[in-house]
Amino acid sequence: LNVSFLGVYSACASFISSIIILANSISGKLIKEGLAFTSSHNLCSEKQFRFPVEYGALKPIYSTFTCTGSVGCNVSKYPSRIKVISSTIGSVVDYGIKDANNMGAVMAPSAVDTLIKHLEYTNTKVNDYDLILTGDLGLYGADLFKMILKKDYGINIRNYIDSGSIIYNKEQEKYSGGSGPVCLPLVLFNNILNNKRYKKIIVIGTGSLHCPTLVNQKKSIPSTSHLISLEVE
């Protein structure tokens, strides 16, 4: 295809990174529109970052199950009912977690850090939004996200959903929930944006910046989270 291509990788925050790049390129009049894609596959992720499924390694209850799927969207200068209003690129945060199965604990601190920075930059409060949506913290990571907000910043968040926590139903028994770059956009486009209750939405992509070498060396796992603010007509 004779179309400009840019490969983006921010772990499970990659899709939000793509949206930020496209939206800012359009705002700067560099392009008129662009396509953002992301995908993930359970077996590939397990083999690359943890253990092959055939190995039969046991997983702790706080681990997550990588989603298999693919999502694409068009970001354009032309008007539509969904608008990207603002964005915040997150910093790298490291809380010293070394367990590659405990991605929720790895990513929750960076999600909080990015959210707080965005609220400060935009002079807004959590209650100014209808929903705060995170990517793939899972059940335990989502609880940690809320706990840090309350303990460190005095914010008792109620308008909050984690994509990984709701993408699977209880009968599927997928540990702490879903994960992977595609987890957030699957929930965002198939569920959240079709719900007319949500007009102003903060979407936080959460990414764990680890690799097998880092884990095998018993190094701590850093993370980063990127954020976009959407308005839906």
Report each predicted region and the residues it spans.
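Claisen-condensing/thiolase-fold acyl-transfer catalytic domains that form or cleave C-C bonds
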Residues: 1-31, 40, 45-47, 78, ...
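Condensing-enzyme catalytic core mediating Claisen C-C bond formation in acyl metabolism
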Residues: 52-117, 121-124, 155-166, 198-206, ...
